[in-house]
Every structure is written in C-alpha cells, then in structure tokens.
Amino acid sequence: SPSYVNWVALRGFLVDGKSDTATKMWKEGLKIYPLSKADAPPSMEFINGSGKTFNTIHANNFKFYEELNQIVQREPIKLFSPEIRGQFASIGIQKGKPFNPDQRMKSILTDAVAVANATARATLWNERNSEEFLYDGSYWKRGYPGNNYQFLKDEGLGGRNLDARTMFYYFATVNTPMMAIELVGKGSQYAWGYLDSNGNFLDGSKNYKVNIPGDAPALKFWSMCVYDPQTRSMLQTNQPYPSKQSQRDTNMIVNEDGSVDLYYGPDAPEGMEANWTQTVPGKGWFVV
C-alpha cells in the first residue's frame, strides 16, 4: 500500500454464541510487524473497542477541508494521482504548503461541502437507479448498484458509476469482491433497506415485523443490524447491540415452520422481547 496508514477488517465467527474462540485465534495467530524486525517481532498490542464511542464520520462543514489537508500533509505524495492532487491544489491544498484560504474562499468551500453532503445523502436515500434494488417491486437494496464492487457499469464498458461509488462510501466503509461475488457456501451477501412495504421511510416511533424464513440460505449465520441514517453507524439505544444474529441470539423464539419473526419499535411486543430490536421515536433508521 502507498499509504502510511492501513486499516484491515477481519471477521471471527462465534462458537456457541461466544467470541472466545475467535478472540483467542486473533491474539495467538495474528502477527503484524515491519519486515526489518522479522527475526524478533515485537509483541502485538490488542485494544478492546467494545463499549467505546468513536466518531467515524467526516465533517460536513469547513472542517472537512482541514481533515483533507491533514491527510495530504501526512501521507506520501504517491498516495494520490496527479489528477487528484491537481484538484486539491485548485482549492489551496498542496503537500508542503500551508492551507490558509481567505474569507471569500472559506465561504465558497463551506457552501460546496454543504451541497456535496446533501447530494450524497440524496443519492443514498432518494435514488432513481433501479439497479440498486434487489429485484423489481422490492424496496430492499443491494450494496453495489449493478453488483460490481468496482462500481463499473456493464463490466466496464460504461465506465465507472460515480454516483454508485458516492452512494456506497457515504453509508459504508470496507469494500471487498467477496461482498459482491455470489459463491455457494462462501463469502457474504448483503441487502439493506430504509423503506417499509408501502415505500415509506422507516420511523422509529412505529412498529414493524420482518420474517426470516426457516430455510434462509445462510451457511454460518444471518444478521439484521439497525443503523442511524444520520451517522450511518449503529443506532444508539438502551440495548447493547441494535441487532439480531442467529449464532449469538440463540434465545430467539422460532415459529413452527422454522422461521423467525423479528420486531422493531420503541417498545417490545409482549412475550417477544428476545426477538425485538429497539428504535428511537422521532428518528429514522435503516437495516442491513
């Protein structure tokens, strides 16, 4: 990688609903060190991030450009192509030089980032591209419009779908071919949604039910996780996990046909607390 900072997402599966086996595997088997220290690699430091609060979204005001300038100054020049560096330089951001726009330029940039943020949100929440939906008549969406992790249209003949890329990275972070390639028994498949069966936005003050079929095609597990449309991070509620997961939540009530009814709303239906995920009145939500 040409970057000084690398971020790798690894997934360890639960065993008997617990993470102990995966934790042990990573702590004993994961070794990251400079090649210059291969003969005597330093000990790994593992930090438990559970229960901690992190701000993982970029600013949507003038501070966005200050964040961008920090990256340009910190990273090696080859991280960005000459074309991208030219765009940065056109607004006063260049490696080795101070970023100090005058009041006129600050005003222009502040307006620009507000419009850009609104455009990205509209692309995500009010799309007009039918390729984003799983099938005709469905309000469930796929992570990659056209199901291409490189956002290429018609296998590249139509170039790169820039709106699709903007949409994806506005609400997601990691990208891998295995989230798009359909291999039986391998990889992972994702669907997400923010509309109910009538096409209305999901409302945290209302109640909803989703049925997971007993023969859902999931070899390891299925999961339904609730997110906040403002932060695009997990919805903050009184529950430690705003989600239901078939490996972890073994106490869920299962129907006679093997299916599972999941409930969403501000309060749990009586007797179905194990199948309920809390939402926040006055706030929207979406599910992956």
Regions inferred by a protein language model and the residue ranges of each:
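A compositional/structural signature for long, glycine/proline-rich flexible linkers
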Residues: 1-288
